[in-house]
Every structure is written in structure tokens, then in C-alpha cells.
């Protein structure tokens, strides 16, 4: 720490650095999936029987696969080759021995002669995957935007050219410090290597020798590679902390709610003074509201004088989700066209909602005539009215801060949909029933990036939000299988063996990432309370 006053450096994300190196913009996921649906419908022809809402879920999966391919600089043409050609491929020189073995393992379990109906459907789609991939990138680039992985790959391919490198590097600061990274994809790694070669990059990793130097420990999988490839500005003696004596307590509860109640006694204990050096960490973000409900109110023993929450939270668990659902149901299912009035059962749901008293009741019961554009404008208007009501609160509590952020995210998504509907090149001229289902799916999939004031009081965080942060005392809740790591599964249309063979993200990598999060979280702590549920009807330990 400098004894003299210094100017604070500028802070940015890795994504910000890539964006400085390109004139292209980053396409929103909603726009990308809708464009992909249009291309899919053209390519598959009569075989494309899915409506947009039916396509959307696995369209997101397909887009995530394309994103992963580009971020790992994989050869998409070879990956999406005809399965017969892939099986007969003799030149495997671009694969490591482990990747070559994974590819051979795939064909041991994929019988081309006796393929099932599901395999035939997979083969039918697979034959068009490269065309979908390349046409999406072409269509987006013509509009001056790309999905993130394609944009990052475009930057790396250009900066590798000697003629463009110097001009591109001039757009970046003279010195760049990379701090706290763990898992790197190939585009990030390539950019770091280019900056290191130009003597403009400095690397500060966050690790412990306990798991990093043990080859069998999955938590150090990526750190071992990073240190070997890029080096470190700090010597290893800075990173021997886990071996120091810590006070670790394991607490078993019979059901989930008891974990939230345990937090109350933890707050009341002498070992948990209310400072920003102490944190409650949730392995399951859906438990945030039960936790907040269990914390003592002002004036009660154990009530923290200051408290801050920083974590992702599912929008479907907030009142704005049920509010929008009630409005959409009213307009799409609740209107009797013969009687020219809304059905009581559907209207009653809206009238009972806590947000109903915040809106213009007369406007809320105007029928939108089955028009999608009018429906979205109707929803946006009412969401704005609710948001305006919350804006009058001078010092919102944690609940109110969370709900304000949920309202903002909902308004943002509705605005995006409206703008897409007004465009001619996006296939959102759909039946209202399709739009209704799409709205529900989109809202249910939103995770609210809830950020409070980290410099104040006790911290409540999800596991991801604790990265690069250290706490003296911690209470970790929901430390159970399926919650840490959180429901890790392969959400991909690319088979696992092929993902391994072409160097894409695999389940093994995801597990290693969460193992690192856990060890890094506790490596400098003095006291840690770990709480798990042992009930037979709950998550297994």
C-alpha cells in the first residue's frame, strides 16, 4: 500500500477491453435467438414446425453452443461436419491425445447403422448446424453487431494480423493489470498473451498453494495452467493461507427454513460483529427472501444496524412476475368477445395483486384488441406506473431495492421485445398465444443482478458474488449437493464427447470452477459456519 496519495486506476471487465478493440456492437440475446429462428425456419423448410416460443429454449442452447465454439476458437466446420465424415476422419493432428480419445469414445456409443428416431432427428439437425452457425454470423455482421463469442473471436483474428495489431493496441491503456481471474477461454487467453508479449500486461492471481500445487485437486485445474502460461507478479509465499488454523463449524438442520433461522442466532452471537468483513453466503439464491424474512426487525435482538445484499435473484420469485402474468392473462385469456367484458375469475387475480393500487385502474381494464404491439405498450405503461410509485420511496429497504431492480429488468425486456416487433427482419409477427408463452419464458429466465452498497454493514451474497472478496467471518447456507455446485448439467446440443474432443466447456470444467470458488472463499477466513440440510425430503448432503 502506497504511503502517498495516488490516483485510482480505471476499472473495467474483460468484455470492456474487447469492446474497445472493435467497431461492432454486441447483439442482445433476444435479438440473436429471434434471428436464429428466422434462419432456422428458412434452412429447415417444412421440417421447421416449431413456433417461436417452442424454439426459444433450445434456440438459446444453440446460441450458447455457438458462443462457446467461438470463445474457444474451435473449428466449427470440422465440429459440425457430417457425422459419417467425422467418423472417417483420418487427420486428427489438431487434437490432443485426450481429445482424440474423446472423439473415438463418441462413436463407440453412436451407432450410425442402427440409429433411433431421436438419432435420426439429431442427424437431420446436425447436417444444418454449420449453415445455421455461419449464416447467423453473416446476418449479424451485416447489421454491425455480433453475439459475444463471435465478436470476441473477430477481435482476436484481427489483432493477430501484424498489419492491424499496433493500431488496435493503441486503443488500450499502456498498462493493464489482470486481477482475480481463474478460468480463461481461448479468446481471453490469446489477448492476454498478445498483451504480455507487448509488455503491457501484469497478472495477479488469487489462489492457494494447497489446491493449486496438488495435481489431483480439481480446484487448481485452471490456476496451474494460468501460472505456467502467464506467470504471476507475486511470489507464492503470498498464497499459503488455507494451512493456517481456522475455526470451522458444521451445522446440520432438518429442513431448509431452519437454515434461515440459524442465521438469526449467528447474527446475535458474539462471533459475528456487524461489519463489512462478515458475510452470509447463499449457495441457493432463491433462499434470499426466506433469509431476509428471518432476520430480526429493527429494535429486536440481533437486528443488524446495516446490511447489504449483492447477488443474482430469479425474477420469477418477485411480485412483478405475477403482476405481468396477471395482466397478460387478462388481455389474452380473460376477455369475453361476445359479452364485451373481462371474465371475473381472471380479473379477480389482478385486483388482488399488491401492485394494483399503484396503477391507473381504468387503463388497466382496457382491452388491447389482440394486437401484440398494443399489448406490449400496455404492459410498459403499467410497469412504468408501478416504477414511478417506488421512485417516491426515499430510503428503500432491501426488499424494495430488489423489487425496484426487478421492475427495471422487466421494463427493459418489454422494451426490447417491442423494438423487435417493430422490425421487419425479425420474426416476431406471431400469434398472441405464442407471444404470451414467450413472455412467460423470458421473464422466468431473468436473473436480477441485484447490487447494494458493499461498503456498509454485513454482506449477503451468492457464491459468484464473493469472487475476489475476503471475509473474516462467514456463514455459508445451503451447502448441499445440487446447490454447490449448482445443478451442473450439459445444456448443449453438442454431445459431451465431441465437446471434450474440440476443447469446449465440459461438466468437468464447470465442477472445477465451483471447486475453486469454494476453496478461494474460505482460504483467508478466520471463522466459517457451514450449514446444510440433512432432512430425508430435502437435498442430500
Question: Could you tell me what each predicted segment is?
Answer:
Residues 1-13, 18-28, 168-171, 192-193, ...:
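Anion-coordinating catalytic cores for phosphoryl-, nucleotidyl-, and glycosidic chemistry
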Residues 2-170, 186, 366:
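Basic/charged alpha-beta structural segments of nucleotide/phosphate-handling enzymes
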Residues 115-142, 215-243:
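Short, compositionally biased "basic patch" segments
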Residues 132-153, 174-177, 242-254, 502-506:
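Acidic/glycine-enriched edge-of-secondary-structure segments
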Residues 147, 152, 157-160, 170-198, ...:
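N-terminal start-of-domain structural block
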Residues 169, 176-230:
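Extended, H/D-rich, highly charged conserved domains that either
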Amino acid at each position: 500500500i502506497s504511503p502517498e496519495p495516488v490516483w485510482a486506476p480505471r476499472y473495467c471487465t474483460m468484455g470492456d477491453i474487447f469492446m474497445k478493440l472493435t467497431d461492432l456492437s454486441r447483439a442482445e440475446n433476444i435479438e440473436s435467438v429471434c434471428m436464429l429462428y428466422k434462419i432456422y425456419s428458412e434452412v429447415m423448410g417444412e421440417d421447421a414446425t416449431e413456433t417461436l416460443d417452442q424454439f426459444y429454449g433450445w434456440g438459446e442452447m444453440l446460441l450458447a453452443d455457438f458462443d462457446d465454439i467461438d470463445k474457444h476458437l474451435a473449428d466449427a466446420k470440422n465440429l459440425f461436419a457430417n457425422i459419417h465424415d467425422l467418423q472417417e476422419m483420418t487427420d486428427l493432428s489438431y487434437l490432443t491425445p485426450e481429445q482424440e480419445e474423446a472423439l473415438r469414445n463418441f462413436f463407440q456409443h453412436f451407432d450410425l447403422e442402427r440409429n433411433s428416431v431421436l438419432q435420426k432427428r439429431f442427424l437431420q439437425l446436425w447436417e444444418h448446424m454449420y449453415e445455421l452457425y455461419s449464416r447467423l454470423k453473416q446476418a449479424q455482421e451485416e447489421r454491425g453487431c455480433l453475439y459475444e463469442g463471435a465478436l470476441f473471436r473477430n477481435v482476436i483474428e484481427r489483432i493477430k494480423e501484424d498489419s492491424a495489431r499496433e493500431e488496435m493496441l493503441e486503443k488500450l491503456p499502456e498498462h493493464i493489470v489482470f486481477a482475480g481471474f481463474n478460468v480463461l477461454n481461448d479468446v481471453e487467453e490469446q489477448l492476454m498473451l498478445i498483451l504480455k508479449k507487448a509488455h503491457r500486461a501484469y497478472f495477479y492471481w488469487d489462489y492457494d498453494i494447497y489446491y493449486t500445487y496438488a495435481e489431483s485437486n480439481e480446484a487448481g485445474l485452471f490456476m496451474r495452467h494460468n501460472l505456467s502460461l502467464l506467470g504471476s507478479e507475486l511470489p507464492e509465499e503470498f498464497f499459503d493461507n488455507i494451512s493456517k488454523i481456522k475455526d470451522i463449524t458444521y451445522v446440520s438442520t432438518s429442513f431448509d427454513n431452519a437454515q434461515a433461522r440459524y442465521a438469526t442466532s449467528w447474527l446475535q452471537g458474539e462471533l459475528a460483529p456487524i461489519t463489512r468483513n462478515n458475510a452470509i453466503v447463499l449457495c441457493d439464491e432463491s433462499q434470499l427472501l426466506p433469509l431476509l424474512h428471518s432476520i430480526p426487525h429493527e429494535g429486536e435482538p440481533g437486528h443488524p444496524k446495516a446490511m447489504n445484499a449483492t447477488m443474482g435473484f430469479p425474477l420469477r420469485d418477485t411480485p412483478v412476475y405475477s403482476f405481468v402474468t396477471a395482466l397478460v392473462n387478462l388481455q389474452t385469456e380473460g376477455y369475453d368477445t361476445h359479452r364485451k367484458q373481462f371474465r371475473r375469475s381472471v380479473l379477480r387475480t389482478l385486483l388482488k395483486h399488491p401492485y394494483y393500487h399503484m396503477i391507473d385502474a381504468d387503463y388497466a381494464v382496457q382491452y388491447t384488441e389482440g394486437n401484440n404491439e398494443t399489448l406490449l405498450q400496455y404492459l410498459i405503461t403499467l410497469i412504468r406506473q408501478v416504477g414511478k410509485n417506488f421512485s417516491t420511496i426515499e430510503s428503500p429497504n432491501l426488499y424494495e431495492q430488489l423489487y425496484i431492480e426487478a421492475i427495471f429488468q422487466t421494463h427493459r425486456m418489454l422494451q426490447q421485445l417491442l423494438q423487435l416487433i417493430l422490425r421487419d427482419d425479425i420474426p416476431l409477427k406471431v400469434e398472441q398465444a405464442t407471444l404470451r408463452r414467450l413472455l412467460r419464458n423470458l421473464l422466468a429466465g431473468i436473473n436480477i443482478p441485484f447490487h447494494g452498497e458493499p461498503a456498509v454493514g454485513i454482506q449477503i451474497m451468492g457464491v459468484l458474488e464473493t469472487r475476489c472478496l475476503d471475509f473474516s467471518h462467514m456463514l455459508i447456507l445451503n451447502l448441499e449437493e445440487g446447490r454447490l455446485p449448482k445443478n451442473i448439467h450439459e445444456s448443449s446440443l453438442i454431445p459431451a464427447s465431441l465437446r471434450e474432443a474440440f476443447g469446449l466447456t465440459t461438466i468437468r470444467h464447470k465442477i472445477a470452477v465451483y471447486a475453486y470458488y469454494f476453496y478461494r472463499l474460505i482460504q483467508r477466513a478466520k471463522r466459517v459456519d457451514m450449514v446444510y440440510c440433512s432432512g430425508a425430503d430435502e437435498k442430500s448432503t
